[in-house]
Amino acid sequence: MLLTIDDVLTQEELAIARSMLARSAWVSGLVTAGTQAAQVKNNQQVQENDPQIVNLRRLVLGALNRNALFFTATLPEKIVPPFFNRYSGETNHYGFHVDNAMRLLPDGSGYVRTDVSATLFLSDPQEYDGGELVINDTFGQHGVKLQAGSMVIYPSSSIHQVTPVTRGERLACFMFIQSMVRNPDQRRLLYEMDMALLQLRQNIGETPAVVSLTGTYHNLLRQWADS
């Protein structure tokens, strides 16, 4: 399931994030690339030991924690601490690749299974040319270029790329989520059911039928969630 989520960050949070990024130390994006990705990755990211990264991660994770749509779409069990990247000048693209199935946590404490990948845009589209996130799925190819503060989520199994940035600078945050429900089809059905229940509550209230369907949703989640 490919889904965009608007206004994950407030304008104030976005300004704070960009201010911190302006003071950050940048290194080659190859530091987090797998064997295949290293052949096509040409960008920069914030250095792991940079003093800004703790506050940047806290800001993003705090925004995700209050976002109900992010929760219902991903059903997060674990989130790899977010990374921050930059595309500009000579380090301006990331060719087609697939994300590693398992990601080592930055502190080396263990691995997280990548079920869902997410990109949070930190630059507005008019600030740069190119830089589309292009995602392939069973329905074709999708180009995504969102307003700053908005996010796209998609299955980590998807082949995707970032096209060359030919003008300006593209700042973004990317992360990987291990979902409570690893099967993407089951996760999509639960999301669609939750959205339908939300609409029913708005239209007719908490009727006995809505309560019953809510119970069915939670029973399915109970059945499909990893034990």
From Swiss-Prot:
Keywords: Dioxygenase, Iron, Metal-binding, Oxidoreductase, Vitamin C. Its cofactor is Fe(2+); L-ascorbate. The keyword Oxidoreductase applies. It is an enzyme of class 1 (oxidoreductase). GO terms for biological process: DNA damage response; intracellular iron ion homeostasis. Fe cation binds at residues 97, 99, 160. Residues 78-179 form the Fe2OG dioxygenase domain. Binds 1 Fe(2+) ion per subunit. Signal peptide: none annotated. One of its GO terms (molecular function) is iron ion binding. 2-oxoglutarate binds at residue 170. Its EC number is 1.14.11.-. PROSITE patterns: FE2OG_OXY. HAMAP family: Hydroxyl_YbiX. This is PKHD-type hydroxylase NE2125.
